[in-house]
């Protein structure tokens, strides 16, 4: 078969419609017919249009024909995709409510459920006014209207004045509370010309806007949040406001408790606190140490369970939050078996959040310590929780009576090898003379000795702990057992 006129005549004579082995112009060893047609598309030129913009000749890669488009006439386009009866919805809603109250059960694939329909809301908290439930539209408007005046919050001027005074009182109480917490700085009274400072500035540590921004970053980036508590005072180092925030804003995130520094309390105290806190959240006892730790295997196993729950994710992030100096960075170092976070026996060592890789699918996030503001906490409580540095406290000797109240006499005698004091002042004087810490004229250095006692109290050299709350049905430990194990 050829490519000339004879081949064309033969195809017409025999009625052959196939191209045969006809070659495209430009086809050779380097370019096949498909490549040649593709290159000819660029050299064929653009489309040609007239002065009105109508297409006269289309380009080789254009098609002027418009396909007929239509929607398939199917009733499924206009029906419900999923239908559920009211009884089944109510049954599922009640089962879901019981599951959400149990912190040991996890709701998977939350995004595939209509949570706004399943979660029941209080009528009081609902944004709807529900006016028609109390009074019909016909009673207020129209020819049969019975109400002649609009209903106001106050029926007369006296009620309005009373409500206004209550609002002013609430506002003033809030102002006093903010001033007490040190959140508004020094409050100036221009009329009297004096400045009120209810609390030392050092006791507002851990409440700055920068610290709270770091906390929100950690919460937003974490799938699992670990709340680190001090085993000596778990309720005192618990951030309830943060828990309420997570319960309201991020209910899909997991929150667990880790009772750190359990080596500083007796075993029965740690066990009682774990039993008490486990009723609310999963709780683990932990002792942070790279060489000799406790609870490390249980914590890693729990994190692996959370990782297996979220198999649809490539990895999960675990954030550590809590009061300053509770051991968040030490727990991360214990899990990694080496020093990856900077640690110190003083609060405020961690400045910003930090990402650490634990394994292929689990990442850890370290967070600076935060102190939720509370009007119930005194300066003494804040100091004894290790929130502030003792060397920055003015007149530290005023907090020594609180140390003597929280510690047993035998523990102080065993620690400092002294005895025979009657009050805090005499205790400081005896200890100062024993250690030779005297000023000019043989006066004891009360400030220096008091700072030493407070540091020993916070760092665990003096044994102390808070007893767990007693519940009905629980046996109270015997006094002899408490004295023996303390």
Curated annotation (Swiss-Prot):
Q: Where is the CP-type G domain?
A: 212-373
* Protein's recorded name: Nucleolar GTP-binding protein 2
Q: Which residues carry this modification: Phosphoserine?
A: 60, 85, 155
Locate the residues binding GTP: 322-329, 366-370
Q: Where is the signal peptide?
A: none
Q: Does the keyword S-adenosyl-L-methionine apply?
A: no
Please state which protein family the record places this protein in: Belongs to the TRAFAC class YlqF/YawG GTPase family. NOG2 subfamily.
Checking Gene3D superfamilies in the record gives: 1.10.1580.10, P-loop containing nucleotide triphosphate hydrolases
Q: Name one GO biological process term.
A: regulation of ribosomal subunit export from nucleus
MF annotations from Gene Ontology: GTP binding; GTPase activity; large ribosomal subunit rRNA binding
Family annotation (Pfam families)? MMR_HSR1 (PF01926), NGP1NT (PF08153)
Protein purpose? GTPase that associates with pre-60S ribosomal subunits in the nucleolus and is required for their nuclear export and maturation.
Principal location class: nucleus
């Amino acid at each position: 078969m050829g490519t000339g006129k004879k081949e064309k005549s033969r195809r017409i004579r025999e009625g052959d419609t196939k191209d045969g082995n006809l070659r495209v112009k430009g086809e050779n060893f380097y370019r096949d017919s498909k490549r040649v047609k593709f290159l000819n598309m660029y050299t064929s030129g653009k489309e040609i249009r007239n002065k009105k913009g109508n297409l006269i000749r289309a380009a080789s890669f254009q098609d002027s024909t418009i396909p007929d488009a239509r929607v398939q006439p199917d009733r499924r386009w206009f029906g419900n995709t999923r239908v559920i009866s009211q009884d089944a919805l109510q049954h599922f809603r009640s089962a879901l409510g019981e599951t959400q109250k149990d912190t040991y059960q996890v709701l998977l694939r939350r995004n595939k459920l209509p949570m706004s329909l399943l979660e029941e809301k209080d009528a009081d908290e609902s944004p709807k006014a529900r006016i028609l439930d109390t009074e019909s539209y016909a009673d207020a408007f129209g020819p049969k209207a019975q109400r002649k005046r609009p209903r106001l919050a106050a029926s007369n001027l006296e009620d309005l004045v009373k409500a206004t005074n209550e609002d002013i009182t609430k506002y003033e109480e809030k102002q006093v509370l903010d001033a007490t917490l040190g959140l508004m700085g020094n409050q100036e009274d221009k009329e009297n010309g004096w400045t009120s400072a209810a609390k030392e500035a050092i006791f507002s540590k851990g409440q700055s806007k920068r610290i709270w921004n770091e906390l929100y970053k950690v919460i937003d980036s974490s799938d699992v949040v670990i709340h680190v508590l001090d085993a000596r005072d778990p309720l005192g180092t618990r951030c309830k406001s943060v828990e309420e925030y997570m319960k309201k804003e991020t209910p899909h995130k997991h929150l667990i408790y880790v009772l750190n520094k359990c080596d500083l309390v007796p075993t029965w105290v740690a066990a009682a606190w774990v039993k008490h806190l486990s009723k609310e959240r999963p709780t683990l006892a932990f002792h942070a140490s790279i060489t000799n730790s406790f609870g490390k295997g249980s914590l890693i196993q729990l994190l692996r369970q959370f990782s297996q729950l979220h198999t649809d994710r490539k990895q999960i992030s675990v954030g550590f939050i809590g009061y300053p100096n509770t051991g968040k960075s030490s727990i991360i170092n214990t899990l990694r078996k080496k020093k990856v976070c900077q640690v110190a026996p003083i609060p405020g060592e961690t400045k910003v959040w930090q990402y650490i890789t634990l394994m292929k699918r689990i990442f850890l996030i370290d967070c600076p310590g935060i102190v939720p503001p509370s009007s119930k906490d005194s300066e003494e409580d804040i100091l004894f929780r290790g929130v502030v540095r003792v060397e920055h406290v003015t007149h530290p000797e005023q907090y020594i009576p609180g140390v003597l109240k929280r510690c047993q006499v035998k523990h102080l005698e065993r620690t400092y090898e002294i005895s025979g004091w009657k009050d805090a002042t005499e205790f400081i004087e005896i200890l100062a003379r024993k250690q030779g810490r005297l000023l000019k004229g043989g006066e004891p250095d009360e400030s220096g000795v008091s700072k030493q006692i407070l540091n020993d109290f916070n760092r665990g050299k003096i044994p102390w702990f808070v007893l767990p709350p007693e519940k009905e049905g629980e046996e109270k430990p015997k006094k002899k057992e408490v004295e023996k194990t303390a």
